[in-house]
From Swiss-Prot:
Pfam families: RdRP. It comes from the Eukaryota. It catalyses: RNA(n) + a ribonucleoside 5'-triphosphate = RNA(n+1) + diphosphate. Probably involved in the RNA silencing pathway and required for the generation of small interfering RNAs (siRNAs). The keyword Nucleotidyltransferase applies. It comes from Oryza sativa subsp. japonica (Rice). This is Probable RNA-dependent RNA polymerase 4. Keywords: Nucleotidyltransferase, RNA-binding, RNA-directed RNA polymerase, RNA-mediated gene silencing, Transferase. Signal peptide: none annotated. Expressed in shoot apical meristem (SAM) and panicles. InterPro entries: RNA-dep_RNA_pol_euk-typ.
Length: 1183
């Protein structure tokens, strides 16, 4: 008998070197030799398919006979080839070009960069460690998994499988841009949940939904793996990592490479064997052009039913040749966009989706988007952008803009609510396969909820059944690429877990609930402080504990109470490097780095000024710090003191000595194409915001209700209301009122109305009148909902007293003119408890002045007492929270404080799972599952609790209740307050909060605009009624003015060629804007698109983002700005529509203002708009 297992002697065919090496490894491990027939069949398959077969066998749990398994798998390969009409290796040799099936190479169920010798099934290496091998366990019994497990939706029967377990392949076709995945096909792929790849391993809690495809249990166990490297496995992995859904039409099911994603450093040669010449040629273009090509190939025509199958034009090979691709390389972005639009873009996308801002400055951030939708049961991916922003996140700075993809998972448009299971069924596949764009693959990295404030706004809109955009953002990062231009790359050769370790050692987080909450710190929009952290002393000091009257530490629910939650200290020299006036990462000029050149920074022309408080994200040797730091002149230079309450992620002990580099060095190395493979941790000091001069302050319905409940009379609020209405009414006719209202909405209008007024343009100017009228109506709407301007109040960032000298109810309030003395009211939004408004004593402290110097604009709380004052106010802290501080004498005269809030509900102390309870693949699937639940099944407990609380408060303020009923209502309100505060912290605590039905109301006061309703006579109802009455609005009785041009602009001589050029551009703008108006998109998306549209024409005018940055001759700019003005105003007059004038001011507004000032006034004074908007112009109106 043939020792090889064959019946007849056959000449052994020559195998490709990599295949032969892999076969020898298998034979040595199994103690069996493959027969000549098996070898012949491997040779006939060709190298990629043979590699696929051998790797599948290597991953099988048990192998009865090696030769029989090879023949069975080879037969399966041939059957698939025949079904698709794909030639064998022999016949393929006669055909030019790569065959599609040969591009399909499956991957192993595990991956380790350095495999371990003799690892038992129960041995586990820490995830992300250099010697990591993913444990081969699917269930908790520790057994290794050789079968391929799959999810069985609705307990559907499995499709036909092989005797040894189903094996599938990944298809990498010459890529289509519209990707589809239909989970309900009869030929279900098992790889949607194979182990080893992020998001592919099922958590143990889902085991009951899984089946094992292998119907036969072989009797011989496969010996353990040896650590010798596998060239076939490496070859296959390199090819398959680039495979994915983008290259396939909607019909097939793609199979995810079942490994933790890792980038093979030498993928290019392999990829060249399996992709089209066009795809390779794309690698010669800059990535923004590549992305736009795929965005223009995405089927996204508004109002047009998408085709049942991917349109032929969606394949790059059908629309571009290699020569045409290379011809695009030297084109400007405008020429490039025009070419691809006329070639194929107009067939696939609407004109309104064309890229607008093509010539953005190099300092601007480019954000790449991908919308994932379910169309007719098929998942499609639409690439959009890049969108231009003026700030980057830490993630973008480390990886580069083009390596980060913001992915929006869209809801299904339907009259009926779509069940969460539908989204889980379809969208999990996206995370498992990744998102393929050309020869790049992007994989799930993190998601971020919109934050408390945005989340509450979203919840309120959802509660009111209004259409809104989800505040949850999902980020994918590029992990693999087959283009030479993409190497070197900092994530090359890393798993997703190791990639996350670059930013912070997130594996040390204790619970899954906090995993993404903490990791999302890297996607805050920030400014990098230019400081080498290796030269900075970052010292951990203890938090200041709360002490009782006996000097013992106070605990609540087993947790120590502290006074310094979220705040630390920073030396003066480092504070001087920071932006003096920075709010949420915004500066006057686009920049990502702050250095000592403080004279350029907005809000300060004195380099000795620096912020008192800096809200930061500090990434240091694997740890992550979140909070604020207070300037302390006592500290030695280059020193930062952080506290345990700020330390959100600790350094993993086993990685504490790894190589760390500054994020700015990463940027430099990436730009210089230097290798970053040795980097294991990125250090960075990221500024989120700083303490600033308070802007104008406003009341809210909640604040009015609490103040009135505390004794402030109705008359006070009605007087505020009357003043606000008169100011809004007179905004069109008085400079003081006009400036106030213009600055109230400066962020919405680029401060253009304020710029026009300050430039000397008369209030009667047609467009200015229309904008002031519009802003007046917005102001009235805000007033109607309780947003009323109030004097002698401030928004101040809070921190703790660094001296320990303030008493339990004393605070230090530092304003423009220094420290304040006397009583103050302090409140923290969104407090609901009557005790959330405190009456405190503002105390002058020379000791604090010695510590902070001349820094201003903050409130410092004491570090004495049994409980932190911040904790007493809406469970707040000092990690950047803003407090409302009032010195208003009438409020102080009437308000009577209540006892502080004390939590009455203790969350369930159930043990939560942490990341260490999952292997890497299980963890990725669980994390993405949590994202989908957050996105498509969010909790509305916060909004529900707040809504019902306000209804009960309205009854307390309105109806004469007997004592028993009043106590019952107050009891319900206190329960709602507790539930509300629990819901605020529920995401990070892993709790689910439900509002009991007995706390829910059945009717709402009319000022809440909800049904069923009753008419409220409370102070809130009266404000609503009076502000909503149109009679006092003088503007309602004024006839629309005629549209006239200012002589300064109308009489400017403009060369005919210039006017003709801008007339053409204006006509183009009208066509694009008409399409945008007609789109059925959410308002946020429309807003972004319109802004991009205006930015496009601003670049054409200025040759830069703004007038202040233009390199062009100013006289030329002024001529073109006047041409734009003349064209827009002529159109507005002919259409009798003043809104048509807006194009001139949104595109050329800054140039027009500058030109008007120079032309009419002669002298001009440069003044900071940021400074001016913090002032209130106080002329009073009385009839």
């Amino acid at each position: 008998m043939n020792p090889h297992g064959g019946g007849n002697q056959m000449r052994e065919p020559a195998l490709p070197a990599a295949v032969g090496a892999e076969l020898e490894r298998l034979e040595a491990r199994l103690g069996q030799l493959a027969c000549a027939e098996a070898r012949r069949q491997l040779a006939e398959l060709g190298e990629p398919a043979a590699a696929r077969v051998l790797r599948a066998i290597g991953e099988a749990r048990q192998v009865r006979t090696l030769s029989g398994f090879i023949r069975h798998m080879a037969n399966q390969e041939r059957m698939k080839r025949n079904a698709r009409g794909i030639p064998t290796a022999h016949s393929a040799a006669c055909i030019s070009g790569p065959c599609r099936e040969e591009e399909s190479i499956s991957t192993p169920l595990y991956y380790n960069e350095v495999q371990m010798d003799a690892q038992t099934p129960n041995d586990m290496v820490e995830v992300g460690s250099p010697n990591q091998q993913m444990p081969l366990r699917l269930h908790d019994n520790g057994g290794s998994v050789g079968h391929i497990a799959r999810v069985v939706p609705d307990l559907a029967n499995p499709a036909v499988g092989s005797p040894y377990g189903r094996i599938s392949s990944v298809l990498l076709q010459n890529q289509n841009c519209v990707e589809g995945y239909t989970p309900s096909r009869g030929m279900v792929s098992p790889a949607s949940n194979q182990v080893g790849s992020p998001g592919h391993r099922m958590p143990s809690g889902l085991q009951r939904h899984m089946e094992i495809d292998s119907p036969i249990q072989p009797i011989v166990s496969t010996p353990e793996r040896v650590s010798t490297p596998s060239p076939v496995r490496d070859l296959s992995r390199c090819v398959e990592n680039m495979a994915g859904p983008s290259g396939s039409p909607p019909c097939p099911i793609w199979v995810m490479p079942q490994i933790p994603p890792a980038i093979c450093p030498d993928t290019t040669n392999v990829l060249r064997e399996v992709v089209s010449p066009q795809m390779l040629a794309l690698g010669e273009l800059e990535f923004r052009k590549i992305f736009m090509i795929f965005a223009y190939l995405s089927w996204n025509k508004k109002g047009v039913k998408p085709p049942l199958s991917t349109p032929k034009s969606s394949k790059i090979e059908d629309v571009l040749s290699v020569d045409s691709i290379r011809s695009l390389k030297s084109m400007s972005m405008a020429q490039f966009e025009s070419r691809i639009w006329s070639t194929f873009g107009h067939d696939n996308i609407s004109s309104s989706d064309r890229a607008k801002n093509l010539d953005s400055g190099p300092g601007m951030s480019k954000v790449y988007h991908c919308n994932v939708e379910i169309r007719g049961g098929t998942v499609v991916k639409i690439f959009k952008g890049p969108y231009i922003e003026n700030r980057r996140t830490h993630l973008q700075k480390v990886l580069g803009d083009d390596n980060v993809l913001v992915v929006k998972f869209m809801e299904i448009s339907s009259d009926t609510e779509t069940d969460l299971s539908t989204y889980l069924e379809h969208y999990h596949k996206v995370a498992e396969e990744g998102i393929v764009l050309g020869l790049r693959c992007y994989r799930f990295f993190l998601y971020k909820d919109g934050g408390k404030e945005n989340k509450m706004k979203e919840e309120n809109r959802e509660e009111e059944n209004k259409k809104c955009t989800s505040s949850v953002r999902c980020y994918f990062v590029r992990t693999e690429s087959g283009w030479n231009m993409d190497e070197p790359y900092i994530l090359s050769g890393r798993t997703i877990g190791q990639a996350r370790d670059l930013f912070m050692h997130i594996r040390t987080v204790l619970t899954l609930a906090k995993y993404m909450l903490r990791f999302a710190l890297i996607v805050s929009k920030t400014i990098t402080l230019d400081v080498d952290l290796s030269e900075v002393l970052v010292k951990l000091i203890d938090d200041e504990p709360c002490l009782d009257e006996h000097g013992k530490e106070v605990f609540r629910d087993g947790e120590r109470l502290i006074h310094t939650d979220g705040t630390g200290l920073i030396s003066e020299d480092l504070a001087q490097k920071c932006t003096y006036s920075n709010s949420k990462g915004k500066l006057l000029e686009p920049q990502d780095i702050v250095d000592c050149a403080a004279s350029k920074l907005m809000g300060s022309n004195n380099t000795t000024e620096y912020p008192l408080l800096i809200q930061l994200r500090l990434f240091y040797n694997g740890s992550a710090v979140k909070g604020t730091v207070l300037v302390d002149k006592r500290l030695p230079p280059r020193t930062i003191h952080i506290r345990p309450s700020m330390l959100k992620i600790k350094t993993y002990p086993e990685l504490s000595g790894v190589q760390s580099v500054n994020s700015l060095d990463i940027v430099s190395a990436r730009n210089a194409k230097k290798s970053l493979s040795g980097v294991q941790s990125v250090n960075s000091f990221e500024i989120v915001s700083t303490s600033n001069r308070s802007g104008r302050t406003f009341t809210s319905n909640n604040l009015i209700a609490l103040l009135h409940y505390g004794g402030v009379p109705e008359e006070f609020f009605m007087e505020l209301l009357q003043t606000a209405i008169e100011e809004a009414d007179n905004a069109r006719f008085d400079y003081a009122g006009a400036l106030n209202i213009a600055f109230n909405y400066a962020d919405m209008e680029d401060s253009m109305p304020a710029r026009m007024i300050l430039s000397g343009i008369p209030l009667e100017e047609s467009y200015l009148q229309s904008r002031l009228d519009f802003l007046s109506l917005l102001e009235r709407k805000g007033i109607k909902n309780g947003k009323i301007p109030i004097d002698d109040c401030y928004y101040l960032m809070g921190t703790a007293d660094p001296t320990g000298k303030l008493g339990p109810n004393e605070v230090c309030v530092i304003l423009d003119y220094g420290q304040v003395s006397g009583d103050v009211l302090v409140y923290k939004y969104p407090g609901l408890h009557p005790g959330d408004i405190h009456v405190l004593k503002a105390t002058y402290s020379s000791d604090i002045e010695k510590v902070v110097g001349n820094s201003k604009h903050a409130i410092l709380f004491p570090t004495t007492g049994q409980r932190s004052l911040a904790d007493e106010m809406a469970n707040s802290d000092f990690d950047g929270d803003i407090y409302w501080v009032s010195l208003n004498p009438k409020l102080l005269e009437h308000f009577k404080p209540s006892k502080p809030w004390v939590p009455a509900i203790t969350p369930n102390g159930t043990k939560q799972k942490g990341p260490e309870d999952f292997n890497e693949s299980e963890l990725e699937r669980v994390l993405f599952h949590e994202f989908l639940k957050t996105r498509f099944a969010p909790s509305y407990a916060r909004a529900t609790a707040a809504t019902n609380w306000l209804v009960y408060m309205d009854r307390l303020l309105t109806v004469s209740l007997d004592e028993s009923e009043k106590k019952l209502i107050e009891k319900k309100m206190l329960k709602l307050v507790d539930l509300y505060y629990l819901a605020l912290d529920a995401p990070k605590m892993g709790n689910k909060v439900n509002i009991p039905r007995d706390l829910m109301v059945k009717q709402y006061p009319h000022f809440m605009d909800r049904s069923p309703s009753y008419h409220s006579s409370s102070i809130l109802g009266k404000i609503y009624d009076k502000a909503g009455d149109p009679k006092p609005l003088r503007s309602d009785n004024v006839q629309p003015t005629s549209i006239s041009s200012l002589p300064c602009f109308a009489e400017r001589d403009v060369p005919p060629a210039i006017k003709q050029l801008w007339q053409h551009r204006y006509n183009e703008y009208l066509a694009d804007s008409s399409l945008l108006y007609a789109e059925e998109a959410d308002e946020e998306e429309k807003k972004i698109k319109f802004q991009e549209l205006y930015e496009k024409y601003k670049h054409l005018l200025y040759g830069a983002s703004e007038f202040e940055e233009t390199p062009r001759d100013l006289d030329d700019v002024f001529s073109e700005a006047c041409a734009i003005y003349q064209i827009a105003y002529e159109k507005a007059r002919s259409a009798n529509n003043v809104a048509r004038c807006g194009f001139a001011w949104k595109v050329a507004g800054r140039a027009l203002c500058h030109f008007y000032t120079v032309k009419n006034e002669g002298n001009a004074v440069v003044c900071s708009l940021q400074l001016l908007r913090n002032f209130r112009f106080t002329k009073k109106y009385r009839k």
